Design a protein with these regions (language model features):
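Periplasmic-binding protein-like
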Residues: 30, 117-127, 203-233, 241-244, ...
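Pocket-lining segment of extracytoplasmic ligand-binding domains
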Residues: 96, 167, 177-265
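Bacterial N-terminal signal peptides
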Residues: 6-14
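Secondary-structure end/capping motifs
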Residues: 232-309
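N-terminal signal peptide c-region/cleavage motif recognized by signal peptidases
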Residues: 16-18
């Protein structure tokens, strides 16, 4: 697969509709390379950041770049943030790993979830030939990305749903939620999001199950903000949310915009693959309030003395989406 350029400089030639003549610089971490980041790329391509008065600079982490390469997606080095100490105030990623990182790592960023696009577990399970369905995973090795990650949460929550012990009846393998792990025989199946799901058939692997059917609440992909930054720059964060929500709505009603983004950034031009990925986009929340039920599930799945020192309310702020909802923006995002 050709490398793709991950850039998100807003179009300076497009003046924001609010009449503001100077764009506000915002640094954003996209976390990983996945379909959940397409709204941000579309927002840049279509001038939506600039429309809302923002000059957005987006990067992904070095670890995410390595993970993407393991499934055939190569990110140019210029767009990889290798300075882990330079944390962006706004992050697009999973709420579950954010909460785990803060609770279990003294250096974890004090962030709150302000928007959730994936309020239910939506990963699929991709398996090697010979495994017909999810029930056949008992006794097998299942790959996930890392402890506390969305794929780890999904694996543990699925095991609980099926009445399996994750310590005795399945083997969870960290750092293996990619096609290379399947190709090399390190695992029998992996938890995968839309990007890997789309690439799996051509690699000879089968999609054996969609976790959406289990209706498991989750603090999945969304927007998280440093608490201090939010307190000082609430209007900037609100404008970022407006650009994100408007971009998502644009993708959902205009397949050409979505298809163009897939072709440009991910080199995915196959119509069948695009159709499958668009089905995932159509599941994005119309009113993306922070997933409170999902956050509570994080506390339940990762119960520990340290986790019990915190409360779910520490990790979300619904007021921004509520403000946009009350104004009518969520019903007519433009």
């Amino acid at each position: 697969m050709r490398g793709f350029v991950l850039t998100a400089l807003a179009l300076a030639a497009v003046w924001p509709s609010s009449g503001i003549e100077q764009l506000t610089r915002v640094d954003v971490s996209l976390g990983d390379v996945s379909i959940n980041k397409v709204p941000q790329l579309v927002a840049a391509d279509q001038g939506l950041y600039a429309k809302h008065g923002l000059d957005v600079h987006q990067t992904i982490s070095a670890g995410a770049a390595r993970a993407a390469a393991a499934s055939g997606v190569v990110v140019p080095d210029a767009y990889v943030n290798r300075d882990a100490s330079a944390a962006a105030p706004i992050e697009v990623g999973g709420g579950s790993p954010m909460i785990n990182g803060f609770v279990n790592n003294a250096r974890g960023a004090a962030r709150v979830i302000v928007l959730t696009q994936e309020a239910m577990a939506m990963d699929h399970i991709i398996a090697r030939p010979g495994i017909a369905g999810i029930q056949d995973l008992k006794g097998k090795r299942i790959g996930f990305s890392g402890v506390g990650s969305v794929t780890h949460f999904s694996a543990l929550r699925l095991a609980r749903q099926l009445g399996w012990s994750p310590d005795r009846e399945i083997t969870l393998v960290a750092g293996s939620a990619n096609l290379d792990a399947l190709k090399q025989g390190k695992v029998d199946a992996i938890l995968a999001s839309a990007m890997v799901i789309a690439l799996a058939p051509q690699a000879g692997f089968k999609d054996i199950g969609d976790l959406t059917a289990y209706k498991m609440p989750m603090a999945g992909s969304g927007i998280m903000v440093d608490k201090a930054y939010l307190a000082a720059h609430r209007d900037t964060v609100l404008r970022f949310l407006k650009a994100d929500i408007e971009s998502t709505a644009l993708m959902q009603r205009d397949r050409r915009v979505f298809n163009a983004a897939l072709g440009k950034w991910f080199n995915i031009a196959d119509a069948r693959t695009q159709d499958g990925m668009f089905a995932h986009v159509k599941k994005f929340e119309k009113k993306p309030y922070p997933s409170v039920d999902g956050i509570k599930q994080v506390f339940a799945i990762y119960d520990s003395p340290e986790m019990r020192r915190h409360r779910p309310e520490e990790f979300y702020d619904s007021s921004l989406v509520a403000e946009l909802d009350k104004s009518g923006f969520l019903d007519n995002p433009k």
